[in-house]
Curated annotation (Swiss-Prot):
Gene3D superfamilies: 2.60.120.20
The keyword Transport appears for this protein: yes
Protein name: RNA2 polyprotein
Site (Cleavage): residue numbering on this chain: 419-420, 821-822
One example GO MF annotation: structural molecule activity
């Protein structure tokens, strides 16, 4: 008996050993060998698909090829198909009705267009057990829990992650582990010690969504799972699925091959994006609840984990599908119409940064998927393209595409083509603007205020400032309606009331500047006065109206696009002078802003071949005439020169635009605004003198023989006198590109004006007669010639051309009284490149020595509108740069050129450096739209870019408009700074460039003040 028991135990042990060996050794080996051979496929099947590249297994290749070939159908006797394909084509041409059995079966079509994944409706979890995914026994799991360093495997219970409201959009984190506290690696430890911490390796994730829509509804939802650590959809995409939002909860399992490093929170790495397009749920209710279950392993690394063949197959299948769904290297699997459960035509899903849109072409031969299209932050789950014409596909008319049958519940052909979003019921917002018209002025009030004019004001003092970006916050009657409108027509009216005694006098101005930060402009009138402004004396005109165009490039404006708190357009009320005979008490000024929907001011848009005359205006300065004396002042009107007052130089839009040309032919209007008391009077004459400045005036009859205008200021009339000089009075074209700013240089002007008194100023009041002088262009100005202008530096002072300039090239002599060139054409601009920035090598600034062949890399960075650059990269203020800095809006093409000059002291065989030039859309961290490499010692690179903005194509240059990008950035990487001598950046405007409006003007100070007016007695 004991011997029998012993034999029985021996046989049991042998059975257990053989069982274990068969389960873990023999069976996996046979299964792998069987799957890696073709013996289980028929010979006919292999012959049909001979020559096809294998992808792990033949079955997977058939499911994941780029082009799905439909099998040719064999019509066996007695089958439902009674005609061959050629007979069907002939019958279709003869308009013979076909039954469903005589078309390509729908189930075969759907099989070939197999969707990425459709969730299964079930009340039970579909998540596999740990044993199905990892090769681990119960004994081994028990031992691993006792031993430190062994991998541990966890299957979590259901964890609620979030809800989707009736609005139909949701984006929420997907927790991988139940709790993360135990996974934290101590950051105080060394990197070598922290590397021994456990990683998280996720094997499977089950997403469960429980929809609460009515059972008889067809509300659907779709979701995508992605790794938020990646920036591109090709890398981050982990899977997508679709399901109903009603009835039984839906389950879907993904095998994401997801690993998380020690120290990183695994619950922050995955994100689920879900959307319900056809939801008719109220957004105050919950449409669906989402929960998750996971199977993951904790281990030092993946090499200590043994995955089952089932997990390997599932991971590979998910990987192939994800690549086909989301990679820009491959094509995209289209999600089919699953009728009637889920209708997913053109389903749009929010995704991470870069996502794709896929389209497929259905034909009798198969389904062909094109390259995916990147489309913002949306994924079109099912987009089937419209069949192209036979001409575009190169198919003759005889090769007619077979009818694929109907994929919906209706009869007939049903081709669907995808869009980013396609809705059946669209509610359109009302855009009727009837409340804006025929409304009383008091109902059109936007803003009102009261300010005091102090006794100690000086020239340039700002009395009051109204930022337009704050209009939406004021409690005006129509402000809520204006907040609702996309485009508000017309302009804005500013009305000012200021009552001053006629014995007093002061000059005021209301000015509107786009992109102006008033607090940083100081008291310089050249910067404060924009293209749109008006001047007056409240002692003469107690009420003044000023209409301005908020968007100078279009005929509308919007409450919500009026800049930010940093850069915004501003309406400012400015003093043109100090008080002249001030009042005894304080003086107040009240003003109000109204919107004018029926008054549309002309657009302020200039191009290279035309410019509105009202955009070219220039402040000349203030003149004072004492009582009992007679004086005369000579001054030049050169719109190409910047505005100068003392040491302050202002580069406004007029000087920047006119600096692009050599000469101008136009009428000139001189505006004189009386700023002293109207009870002071005098008679004045303004005459034009051709040639250089007069040295003295001995006889008034000499000036009376010249073209002149005699005027005085009327009592009770207007504050400003305007004097026009037609262009035919000027013997030569008006010079625009003069170098000298000082009026004392007598030989550098082609013509000038002389303002002199015919009588002396007399009044019972004390003080001087003071008025402000400005000039503007009238009529249709014509530009002649193209000029690259002169550089404007801090050394440009009273003596004209200074010896301290460091430009690299010799400055040409200014043209004297020569006649101008032929009329300017756009071809001239194509041949002229303007300097933008330059860098010159200096051995003291950089480490190493050129003689020792030291290597030092240098990056030169700048904004291509000439506003910012690295320290040694000097901005050159050419006319092109000044136009970019001073215009408020810009659109069109700009051509750029980078010229690199190598050091001539080094031999060619000693050079190893290269120059890499990149241009970026926004910041240097964004993708570059141009990348060029210069391998020669010296050379140049060229590229072009079209400037486009959100306001009818105009990009805002001086103020923040939501949705508008910053200007382009340039980065020049010098491989070895010691091998180069200089780098220059140049630019040229294209034919389609247009400028609009003026932002805050450029400004710099001189070392010594200059005089614009040359004074002499007579």
């Amino acid at each position: 008996m004991p011997l029998i028991l012993l034999w029985f135990c021996f046989l049991c042990m042998i059975y257990v050993i053989l069982k274990l060996e068969y389960t873990y050794v023999v069976k996996p080996f046979l299964k792998t060998a069987f799957l890696n051979t073709t013996s289980h496929y028929s010979d006919e099947y292999l012959r049909e698909y001979s020559g096809i590249r294998w992808l792990h297994t033949f079955k997977e290749y058939r499911e994941h090829t780029i082009f799905f070939n439909f099998p040719s159908f064999y019509c066996s006797p007695g089958s439902g198909i009674k005609h061959t394909l050629s007979e069907l084509i002939k019958m279709e041409a003869e308009r013979v009705n076909l039954t469903k059995t005589e078309t390509i079966p729908k189930d075969i079509l759907l099989e070939r267009a197999k969707n990425y994944r459709v969730a299964q409706e079930s009340n039970k979890s579909l998540l596999p057990q740990v044993e199905d995914l990892y090769e681990v026994s119960k004994w081994k799991r028990a031992i691993s829990s006792l031993q430190k360093g062994e991998p541990s495997f966890v299957r979590t219970s259901e964890v609620a992650i979030g809800t989707m409201s009736g609005a139909g959009k949701m984006r929420i984190k997907v927790p991988v582990v139940k709790s993360y506290e135990e996974e934290v690696a101590d950051m105080r430890l060394s990197q070598k010690v922290r590397a021994k911490a456990d990683q998280i390796v996720v094997a499977a994730i089950e997403i469960v969504n429980d929809g609460f829509a009515s059972v008889n509804s067809d509300v659907t939802l779709a979701a995508s799972l992605y790794d938020k650590r990646h920036k591109t959809i090709a890398s981050s995409f982990k899977g997508a699925y679709a399901s109903r939002a009603s009835g039984t909860p839906s389950h879907v399992v993904f095998y994401p091959t997801h690993r998380v490093a020690p120290g990183d929170n695994p619950n922050d790495t995955l994100e689920l994006s879900a959307v319900s397009r056809d939801s008719d749920f109220d957004e105050n209710f919950t449409l669906a609840n989402f929960s998750v279950r996971t199977v993951y392993a904790k281990a030092k690394g993946p090499e200590v984990i043994r995955e089952t063949q089932h997990l390997l197959n599932c991971k590979l299948e998910d990987l192939v599908k994800a690549q086909q769904f989301a990679s820009d290297e491959q094509v995209v699997l289209a999600l089919p119409r699953v009728y009637p459960k889920v209708n997913l035509d053109n389903y749009v899903m929010p995704g991470p940064d870069n996502v794709t849109k896929q389209e497929g072409e259905y034909s009798a031969k198969g389904i062909h998927f094109r390259k995916p299209i990147f489309n913002g932050s949306e994924i079109v789950l099912n987009a089937t393209s419209k069949l192209p014409s036979s001409k575009s596909r190169g198919i003759s008319k005889s090769e007619k595409i077979d009818d694929l049958g109907c994929m919906s519940d209706e009869e007939g052909i049903d081709y669907k083509y995808g869009q980013a979003l396609m809705e059946e019921d669209v509610l359109e917002a009302q855009v009727d603007m009837f409340p804006l018209h025929n409304v009383a002025e008091t109902m059109r009030l936007l803003f009102s205020g009261v300010s005091t004019i102090p006794m100690n004001v000086v020239e340039g003092t700002k009395i009051s400032v109204a930022y337009l970006n704050e209009l939406a916050t004021h409690p005006g009657v129509h402000v809520p309606i204006l907040n609702m409108l996309g485009r508000i027509p017309g302009s804005i009216l500013a009305r000012v009331h200021c009552e001053v005694a006629p014995t007093c006098g002061i000059g005021l101005a209301a000015t509107y500047v786009e992109g102006n930060e008033s607090a940083a402009l100081g008291t310089d009138l050249g910067r404060l006065l924009g293209i749109q402004h008006v001047k007056w004396n409240p002692a003469i005109e107690p009420v003044k109206e000023f209409r301005f165009k908020p968007f100078s490039c279009v005929d509308w404006w919007n409450m919500h696009y009026l800049g930010s708190s940093k850069f915004s357009p501003v309406l400012a009320f400015v003093c043109l002078s100090k008080w002249i005979n001030p009042p005894k008490g304080e003086c107040k000024m009240s003003y109000a802003l109204y919107f004018e929907p029926d008054i549309i001011l002309p657009r302020q848009i200039a191009s290279l071949n035309s410019v509105p005359s009202f955009m070219l205006r220039k402040e000349l300065g203030t003149l004072s005439f004492k009582q009992g004396e007679r004086r005369a002042y000579a001054f030049e009107v050169n719109f190409g020169k910047p505005q100068v007052e003392g040491k302050s130089v202002t580069l406004n839009f007029a000087s920047a635009y006119c600096g692009l040309s050599q000469y101008m032919e136009s009428d000139i209007v001189i505006d004189l605004t009386l700023m002293s008391s109207p009870m002071m009077g005098g008679t004045f004459t303004l005459a034009y003198v051709a040639g250089s400045y007069l040295k003295s005036i001995k006889n008034m009859q000499f000036l009376d023989a010249l073209p002149h205008i005699t005027f005085n200021f009327e009592k009770g009339g207007k504050s400003t006198r305007s004097l026009r000089f037609p262009s035919r009075l000027f013997p030569t074209y008006q010079s625009l590109d003069r170098w000298d700013l000082n009026a004392s240089r007598e030989d550098d002007v082609s013509g000038h004006f002389v303002l002199y008194q015919r009588d002396t100023v007399s009044s019972a009041l004390e003080g001087d007669l003071v008025f402000r002088v400005s000039a503007r262009v009238s009529g249709e100005p014509m530009m002649h010639g193209v000029s690259v202008g002169y550089p404007t530096t801090l050394t440009r002072a009273t003596t004209g051309k200074m010896s301290s300039r460091s430009l690299g090239e010799k400055v040409r002599k200014p043209i004297g009284l020569a006649k101008g060139q032929a009329h300017m054409n756009l071809a001239d601009y194509k041949r002229v490149f303007y300097p933008m920035a330059e860098w010159i090598y200096s051995s003291e600034k950089y480490e190493g020595r050129r003689e020792d062949r030291d290597i030092l890399k240098l990056l030169l960075k700048m904004r291509l509108d000439g506003t910012k650059a690295t320290e040694d990269f000097r901005i050159v203020h050419s006319p092109l740069v000044r136009v970019l800095q001073n215009c408020a809006w810009l659109r069109g093409t700009i051509h750029f050129k980078i010229v690199v000059r190598a050091n001539s002291e080094m031999m060619s065989y000693q050079r190893t450096s290269q120059v890499h030039v990149t241009a970026h859309e926004n910041s240097l961290s964004s993708n570059e739209f141009f990348s060029g490499m210069l391998t020669a010692t010296s050379g140049e690179l060229e590229f072009s870019k079209e400037v486009v903005g959100p306001v009818e194509g105009f990009s805002s240059m001086g103020w923040n408009v939501q949705g508008n990008k910053k200007f382009y950035k340039l980065c020049i990487a010098l491989g070895n700074v010691h091998e180069y001598e200089a780098v220059k950046v140049m630019a040229s405007f294209g034919d389609d460039v247009e400028f609009a409006g003026q932002q805050k003007a450029g400004h710099y100070a001189l070392e010594r003040g200059v005089s614009v007016f040359k004074e002499f007695k007579y």
